[in-house]
UniProtKB/Swiss-Prot annotation:
Protein name in UniProt: Lysine--tRNA ligase 2
Cofactor annotation remark: Binds 3 Mg(2+) ions per subunit.
Gene: lysS2
Binding residue positions for Mg(2+) 2: E428
Main location: cytoplasm
CC cofactor: Mg(2+)
Record localization: Cytoplasm
Reactions catalysed, as given in the entry: tRNA(Lys) + L-lysine + ATP = L-lysyl-tRNA(Lys) + AMP + diphosphate
InterPro entries assigned: Aa-tRNA-synt_II, aa-tRNA-synth_II, aa-tRNA-synth_II/BPL/LPL, Lys-tRNA-ligase_II, Lys-tRNA-ligase_II_N, Lys-tRNA-synth_II_C, NA-bd_OB-fold, NA-bd_OB_tRNA
Enzyme class: ligase
SUPFAM superfamilies assigned: Class II aaRS and biotin synthetases, Nucleic acid-binding proteins
Keyword NADP in annotation: no
Length: 511
């Protein structure tokens, strides 16, 4: 008997959903389109396939350090044209690539008349060209290249922003990041730093024999954090799936499986508010190490960030607005209970629940109705009265058990768990635990979370029985840590908005 397999994808012939955004129109410049036609009419290809360079612009600029030796040296490079200045038989322009900018001179006597006319009449700022020429300095001492050959590599059809005003509108910069990167070199440097930051994290952990893994983004059960998920539907499987809110539960499954040092740099998705420190799609790293606890993970977090800051900035101080933040070790460590006493003069456990409610109301702290215990008021009042005062790096440790369903019970303090958060510039930057590895206790915690969810807490976690069963095979004592890449980049770059460090942040659809 032969079984027929249906490989037809039911989504193949489905129309696009009504809410897919297909709005917009092309924004090509009429004069640039006319120049494109002029280029084609000359038999030139406005979009050729490749160009051979013998150096980037930064490498060429270095040669000017020994100008006596390198004057007249022939170079071949490529980049985008900026700020074209025409002076009769001479045309100056800036040529920019990823590494820098240099002035180029197109002189009528150095090019055939037809080529000079082509450049003068048909090239624009924004075009990408390849050049060959010789190094020289102008009478004013500006390092330059005298062009003897040029090739159009890509004709731009959209006009760049006007030189002196540039691209200043924040909304436009976020929606058209490609344009932001073209005209704002300092914005490109932010993302160069971000790329180097991620590379340095990988190097730091690889040096300590951690292994990098990839875990599912589409999950049948979401978990690992208290957050609202994004929901989708898989047509072939006929079931709901969720975009991951954290990789935690899968990484701990790997530790159960025998990997003792694991990490993942992951894209996570949380269906939450958007503000200066939150984006629904964000990047973080989670690290787990067997036979370690939350004290070890605080040590690892401090060593990692201190080394990153020094390697990327050359020092330990970063500027955030009016604050200068010192990231040199050692960092302050204080319990949540102790921090509330130190920064707000408040001892939660010396007050009744009604008194704590009134304190919350007096300080205009929202969501006080959700607090039903001293532990929940401790977390609530800490967030409202202390967090924004933690400018220099500070580890807050020992959290109430009520809001930490994945952390191990404290070895000495009843009602608390071995959890820490790292605060910097008033922001939470990292979070870590001595990981809960008792499957019966984990099941109990999940069930308590599920009760909250059914009562309307949309950020409460669900029961993941497969994870509970994984713990049933034995998770060794384990320390874990999660660190926000976006916020760390903000700190290193001295920026106050998360949208400045995400290349394509989520934006509301334009009407």
């Amino acid at each position: 008997m032969t079984m027929e397999i249906n490989n037809t994808d039911p989504s193949e012939n489905m129309p696009l959903p009504d809410d897919v955004d297909l709005s917009g129109s092309r924004a090509f410049d009429d004069s640039k389109l006319a120049k494109l036609n002029g280029i084609i009419s000359q038999g030139l290809d406005p979009y050729p396939y490749r160009f051979e360079k013998n150096g980037d612009i930064c490498e060429i600029l270095v040669k000017f350090e020994d100008f006596e030796k390198n004057e007249g040296l022939s170079v071949r490079t490529a980049g985008r044209l900026y700020n074209i200045r025409k002076h009769g038989k001479m045309i100056f322009a800036d040529l920019g690539d990823q590494t820098g900018r240099i002035q180029v001179l197109i002189r009528k006597g150095n090019l055939p008349d037809e080529e000079f006319a082509t450049f003068k009449n048909l090239m624009d700022s924004g075009d990408i060209i390849g050049i060959q020429g010789e190094l020289f300095r102008t009478k004013r001492g500006e390092n330059s290249i005298s062009v003897s050959e040029f090739s159009l590599l890509s004709k731009s059809l959209c006009a760049l922003p006007e030189k002196f005003h540039g691209l200043k509108d924040v909304e436009t910069r976020y929606r058209k990041r490609y344009l932001d990167l073209i005209v704002n070199a300092e914005k490109r440097e932010i993302f160069v730093m971000r790329s180097k930051l991620i590379s340095e994290i990988r190097r730091f952990l690889a040096d300590r024999e951690f292994l990098e893994f990839e875990t599912p983004i589409l999950q049948t059960v979401y978990g690992g954090a208290n957050a609202r998920p994004f929901k989708t539907f898989h047509n072939c499987l006929g079931q709901n799936l969720f975009l991951r809110i954290a990789p935690e539960l899968y990484l701990k499954r790997l530790v159960v499986g025998g990997y003792e040092k694991v990490f993942e740099i992951s894209k996570n998705f949380r269906n939450e508010d958007i503000d200066t420190t939150h984006n629904p799609e964000f990047t973080m790293i989670e690290v787990y190490e067997a036979y370690r606890d939350y004290n070890d993970m605080m040590d690892l977090t401090e060593a990692l960030i201190s080394e990153l800051v020094f390697r990327l900035t050359g020092g330990y101080e970063v500027k955030m607005g009016e604050n200068t933040i010192n990231l040199r070790s050692p960092w302050k460590r204080i319990s949540m209970e102790g921090a509330l006493k130190e920064y707000a003069g408040l001892d939660v456990f010396s007050h009744s629940l009604e008194e704590l409610k009134q304190i919350a109301i007096q300080n205009r702290i929202e969501d006080y109705e959700k607090a039903k215990s001293h532990g929940e008021f401790l977390a609530l009042l800490f967030e409202g009265l202390v967090e924004d005062k933690l400018v220099n790096p500070t580890f807050i440790y020992d959290f109430p058990v009520e809001n930490s369903p994945l952390a191990k019970n404290h070895r000495e303090k009843e009602g608390f768990v071995e959890r820490f958060e790292l605060f910097l510039n008033g922001w939470e930057l990292a979070n870590g635990y001595s990981e809960l590895n008792d499957p019966l206790e984990q099941e109990k915690r999940f069930e308590e979370q599920d009760k909250k969810r059914k009562l309307g807490d949309l950020e409460a976690q669900t029961v993941d029985y497969d994870f509970i069963n994984a713990l049933g095979y034995g998770l060794p004592p384990t320390g874990g840590m999660g660190l926000g890449i976006d916020r760390l980049t903000m700190i290193l770059a001295g920026l106050e908005s998360i949208k400045e460090v995400i290349l394509f942040p989520q934006m509301k659809r334009e009407d």
